[in-house]
Amino acid sequence: MTCKENLNNKVNGWLVINKPKFYTSNKVLILLKKKFKFQKVGFCGTLDPLAIGMLPIAIGEARKFIRFVTNHKKTYIFSVKWGISTTTYDIEGPIISKTEFLPNRESIEETLKLFIGNIDQVPPIFSAIRVGGTRA
């Protein structure tokens, strides 16, 4: 019996991957399945291709606990490129407008207050988010 065959039958648990930029969450999952021959594997949530960060992977019986892991608060760290707008709302899309205006600290802090608490949002068309199993 090879190591890979043994892993497929014996591993039940969690693996937390530091997802690299430009990889989709699904691409990470596919690579793990291919490398270790896992048959039952899933991830919690999803990270957009430009995001770098923790991607919890559930292997084997641990998949039964994904629903208990996903409904918790998350923390995001981000950077901002002031003065441009793109068609995709991120740095990847073509720039559609530019400005030399730079907001001051006070106006940034006031604007950030609008994003505290529960907020209903419509995801952009380019988002990887799914609602009810279909892309939002």
How should each PLM-predicted stretch be described?
Residues 1-136:
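Catalytic/RNA-binding core of pseudouridine synthases
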